[in-house]
């Protein structure tokens, strides 16, 4: 598959642009141009042979394998499996950023999958509520994919379509009615193909790119599909909250994979200027986080504003979900260290000890996070993720990317399935307990919990059919779906579209027929994945044992067309029109639907199902309950009950003790029935015959709250406006403790759970440099606090990450982060961190 001559000017221009970008290295312009042009000639002269597919990359030659697909409308693909994109992160490189792979001299066979990153898939310890239904229902199949584990796991898989364009054109001219000759064929004259990099989900703890076969999507959409392995769990996201272990190694793996892709995908016929990242669940939140990181900037084929990728698709996951970021990483690092017998009093010794432990010993430890949260995941380190994702979005850090995102109709299925007798509906007592448990685990403001609990019950009760257990089950499913997925996705779409950046929103309303899910289930978390990958076109698989119908095949073709169109142009409607007559003669209703761009005003979204339509304001009432009313209820409660609770700031000569007798235990566990006994919390839903004073009180309270909020809004208009403007330039954060006190002190001493909305700005200004702050001097916006559990108040801030542990006097900076030499990968962390001034309005 040789690149056409018409692409010469395009690649020459890219080579020249690359020279301009790399001119800063000091090399003479003549030599730079000569080297880049020689490399361009090498790329153009390569030919991908279908019989013996051999590609020469920057690191050596690799041989792939040709695979035929079980569908006559799908051409074969060439698979390159187990391609290394980074060096093994083993030994002293554990808990360090990735380095480039070592070159190889012989031909490397890329015909089978590489080992997966270490993980422990044990039924009963998995966060089932955050995993796809097909994942948890087929653990035996998933386990077969993750048997071969190794820390040497940083590999990717490449799926390249190989259909001969000329042969297709001739056959379509001779037989226009042939199935392969569909209207607006997706072949585009053999030019460089768009690239789609899939990031797998799994709550940052489980999964592998090997699970997801990109062959059908690549063949049908005429795009190159890449799946990636990245470090998971403790090995990918352990953080001590300081320089000893900054965390986010899994995200840095993904960035390295994207850098490898941008520098090598041209050898496979791919376009380095049309790279789209997409993922589902935790993979979707990774996609969102990558759009917010300055490490995603920089592409050798263009100027730095183009980035390592240009478009992003976040399926059922954004950076604003409660489980997207770990706000208490140091606590879980100490819990793990205690379990394996490492010293927790010094973070440097802790990390050195963990580096020497067998990886299996670390992975096998059961470190349970607070419910609806994660123990080991991305952290706000002040570098890879410079600030809270919501703040970064408000500042426009992701405005340069085209973004498509959406949710499934019934994401929260697993939350409801875990309730007793959910198949027969949900009883009033179970409903009450589920809501109470939900509030207790997500909101750390005890003064207002009763009002919040009753407000949620009131809003999620269908008063026209409130005695029906099945109706109660439906509303409870909506509660979990709205809070954990819908509201964060809508908030993300609003923030992105506010900058005029192309934004597309969808709601997925279809799932395949299978006996593994209850009949009452809607499209659950992860149910869109088989349709994106084109599984219905090749029939059931072990992982997706569905009874696929022609409607499933049609819908999969529709979804793949939208996704690949977006990867090609940033517009899901172009260039390929929706036409599935090659499947059956039944009209495709998507042909008459134009997916309109999303804006905060209209909030238009595409309903993806058998009856597609463009609608507006998806679940607006419930979304605004979570984004507007609930944060203001907290604010109102704090204003009405506020008393000064500011902790006295001790002088620096006071040494914090590792523990106190009255300190709260650092371990967290799921709430028990004893803790949240519904009998101790009378509910209006527990019995049928009762007075309705509670509901009336809640109604009056909500109404009074809204009235009072309107009054407050006028009174505080200018104050909030000025505060918002100043917060963009100056956000208060905790002062650093001396030496290693961050890890010595319990979390409750470092950050107060009672973050009051008061005039603490004045307190910030009055704090002297020599003072040690034991609590958040300037509390974050309440909308940010909504994602944090009672024991997950954030330790990480942009300032705390720059700390260098120095419990030993005169110690030198430890665990220097590896840098990439030779001009490659030179934007990953450097040994001596210094404050990074990231642009808030990249253009």
UniProtKB/Swiss-Prot annotation:
One Pfam family hit: COesterase
Transmembrane segments: 698-718
Gene (UniProt): Nlgn1
Organism from which the protein derives: Rattus norvegicus (Rat)
Ranges of the Extracellular topological domain: 46-697
Record keywords: Biological rhythms, Cell adhesion, Cell membrane, Disulfide bond, Glycoprotein, Membrane, Secreted, Signal, Synapse, Transmembrane, Transmembrane helix
Gene3D superfamilies for the chain: alpha/beta hydrolase
Name of the protein: Neuroligin-1
Ranges facing Cytoplasmic side: 719-843
Protein's membrane topology: Single-pass type I membrane protein
Keyword Transmembrane recorded: yes
Disulfide bonds: 117-153, 172-181, 342-353, 512-546
């Amino acid at each position: 598959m040789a690149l056409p001559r018409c692409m010469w000017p395009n690649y020459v221009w890219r080579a020249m642009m690359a020279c301009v970008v790399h001119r800063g290295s000091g090399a003479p312009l003549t030599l730079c141009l000569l080297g880049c042009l020689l490399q361009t000639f090498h790329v153009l002269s390569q030919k991908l042979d279908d019989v013996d597919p051999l590609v020469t990359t920057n690191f050596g030659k690799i041989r792939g394998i040709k695979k035929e697909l079980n569908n006559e409308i799908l051409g074969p693909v060439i698979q390159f499996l187990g391609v290394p994109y980074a060096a093994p992160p083993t030994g002293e490189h554990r808990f360090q950023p990735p380095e480039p792979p070592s070159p190889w001299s012989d031909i490397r066979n890329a015909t089978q999958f590489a080992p997966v990153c270490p993980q422990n898939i044990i039924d009963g310890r998995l966060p089932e509520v955050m995993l796809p239904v097909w994942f948890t229902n087929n653990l035996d199949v998933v386990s077969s994919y993750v048997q071969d584990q190794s820390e040497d796991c940083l590999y990717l898989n490449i799926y390249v379509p190989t259909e001969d364009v000329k042969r297709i054109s001739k056959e379509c001219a001779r037989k226009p009615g042939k199935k392969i000759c569909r209207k607006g064929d997706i072949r585009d004259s053999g030019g460089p193909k768009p690239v789609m990099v899939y990031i797998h989900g799994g709550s940052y703890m489980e999964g592998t790119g090997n699970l997801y076969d990109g062959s059908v999507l690549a063949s049908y959409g005429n795009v190159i599909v890449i799946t990636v392995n990245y470090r998971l769990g403790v090995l990918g996201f352990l953080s001590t909250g300081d320089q000893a272990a900054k965390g986010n190694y899994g995200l840095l793996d993904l960035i390295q994979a994207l850098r490898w892709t941008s520098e090598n995908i041209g050898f496979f016929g791919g376009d380095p200027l049309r790279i789209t990242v997409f993922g589902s669940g935790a993979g979707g939140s990774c996609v969102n986080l990558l759009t917010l990181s300055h490490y995603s900037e920089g592409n050798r084929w263009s100027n730095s504003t183009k980035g390592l990728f240009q478009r992003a698709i976040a399926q059922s996951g954004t950076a604003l979900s409660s489980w997207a970021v770990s706000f208490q990483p140091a606590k879980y690092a100490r819990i793990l260290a205690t379990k394996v017998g490492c010293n927790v009093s010094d973070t440097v010794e802790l990390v050195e000890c963990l580096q020497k432990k067998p990886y299996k010993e670390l992975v096998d430890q059961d470190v349970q996070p607070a419910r609806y949260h994660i123990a080991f995941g991305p952290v706000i380190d002040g570098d890879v993720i410079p600030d809270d994702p919501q703040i970064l979005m408000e500042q426009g850090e992701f405005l340069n990317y085209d973004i498509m995102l959406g949710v499934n109709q019934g994401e929260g299925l697993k939350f409801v399935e875990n309730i007793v007798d959910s198949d027969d509906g949900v009883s009033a007592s179970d409903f009450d307990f589920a809501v109470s448990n939900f509030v207790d685990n997500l909101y750390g403001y005890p003064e207002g919990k009763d009002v919040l609990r009753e407000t949620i019950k009131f809003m999620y009760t269908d008063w026209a059919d409130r005695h029906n257990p099945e109706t109660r089950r439906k509303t409870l499913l909506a509660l979990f779906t709205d809070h954990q997925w819908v509201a964060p996705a809508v908030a993300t779409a609003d923030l992105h579209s506010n900058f005029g950046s192309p934004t597309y929103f969808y709601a997925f309303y279809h799932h395949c027929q299978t006996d593994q899910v209850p009949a009452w289930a809607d499209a659950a978390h992860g149910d869109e994945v088989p349709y994106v990958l084109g599984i219905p076109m090749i029939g059931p698989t072990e992982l997706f044992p569905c009874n696929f119908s022609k409607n499933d095949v049609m819908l999969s073709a529709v979804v793949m067309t939208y996704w690949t169109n977006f990867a090609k142009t940033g517009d899901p409607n172009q260039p390929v029109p929706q036409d599935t007559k090659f499947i059956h003669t039944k009209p495709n209703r998507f042909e008459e639907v134009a997916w309109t761009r999303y804006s905060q005003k209209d909030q238009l979204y595409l309903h993806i199902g058998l009856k597609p339509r463009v609608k507006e304001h998806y679940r607006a009432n419930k979304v605004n309950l979570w984004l507007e009313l609930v944060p203001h209820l907290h604010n109102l409660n704090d204003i009405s009950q506020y008393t000064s609770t500011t902790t006295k700031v001790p002088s620096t000569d006071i040494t914090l003790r590792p523990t106190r007798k009255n300190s709260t235990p650092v371990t967290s566990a799921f709430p028990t029935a004893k803790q949240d006994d519904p009998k101790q919390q009378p509910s209006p839903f527990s019995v049928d015959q009762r007075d309705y004073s509670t509901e009336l009180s809640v109604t009056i309270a909500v109404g009074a709250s809204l009235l009072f909020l309107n009054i407050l809004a006028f009174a505080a208009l200018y104050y909030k406006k000025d505060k918002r403007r100043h917060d963009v330039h100056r956000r208060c954060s905790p002062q650093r403790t001396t030496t290693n006190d961050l890890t010595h002190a319990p979390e409750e001493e470092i950050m107060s759970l009672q973050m009051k909305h008061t005039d603490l700005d004045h307190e910030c200004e009055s704090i002297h440099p020599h003072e040690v702050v034991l609590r958040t001097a300037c509390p974050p916006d309440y909308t940010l606090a909504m994602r944090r559990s009672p024991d997950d108040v954030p330790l990480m801030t942009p300032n705390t990450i720059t700390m260098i542990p120095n419990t030993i006097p005169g110690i030198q900076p430890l665990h220097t982060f590896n840098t990439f030499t030779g001009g490659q990968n030179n934007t990953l962390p450097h040994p001596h961190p210094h404050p990074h001034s990231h642009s808030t309005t990249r253009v």
